[in-house]
Amino acid sequence: MLTGVAGVVAGAASMAVGEYVSVSSQRDAERADLVALERQLQAGAASKAEAERDLAQVHIDRGLPPKLAGQVASTLTNQVEDPAAAHARDRDGVDADNLTSPSQAAAVSLLAFSLGGAAPLATAALLTHDAGLRSASVAVVSLLTLAGMGALSAHLGGAPIGKATARVVLGGCLAIGLTHLVGTYFGVDTT
């Protein structure tokens, strides 16, 4: 039981730190893009015109007629309060007012891992007398928990529930299988 608790704590901490580092890097890249755009737009007429042409091309690629795309790009380059933010939003999909949050991502990851690990851990704690039943029950509860987490995340994100659930369960099966194989290889009792 103590090993299970340690595993959940270590896994949750690892996931949270990994998510924090990853999202921090993404946010740093977004900020660097904004600074580069601001510099480009302030570097002189030729540089500003190049940024405007690039933005017009983005809108042409999205289906606007060239003349209208040019008008949109000109307006976003010359007539809005924050041209760099407008370019970043339209060109790169970066919202300058709503950059990614490393702390929020880490907290969600920590919570998801902890909740995902709690159900199998509780199952193992309740079924202490029959190792075979405990092992099978933990596997089933783990898969049901994965399915529930996959469905919930798909629902919250507005994604197709079946596809997301299948992906999470398949990934979980692979992870469980790999963990079992490694444990068996090293002679760890996996029941």
Where are these regions (language model features)?
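Generic transmembrane alpha-helix signature in multi-pass membrane proteins
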Residues: A119-A124, L152
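Small-residue-rich segments of transmembrane alpha-helices in multi-pass membrane proteins
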Residues: G117, R167-H180
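Juxtamembrane boundary at the C-terminal end of a transmembrane helix
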Residues: H180-T191
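Core segments of transmembrane alpha-helices
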Residues: S109-P120
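Structural signature of hydrophobic alpha-helical transmembrane segments
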Residues: G132-L144
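Cytosol/matrix-facing amphipathic helices and coiled-coil assembly/linker segments
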Residues: V23-L110
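Internal alpha-helical transmembrane segments
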Residues: M1-S22, Q26
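Interfacial loop-to-transmembrane junctions
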Residues: G148-C173
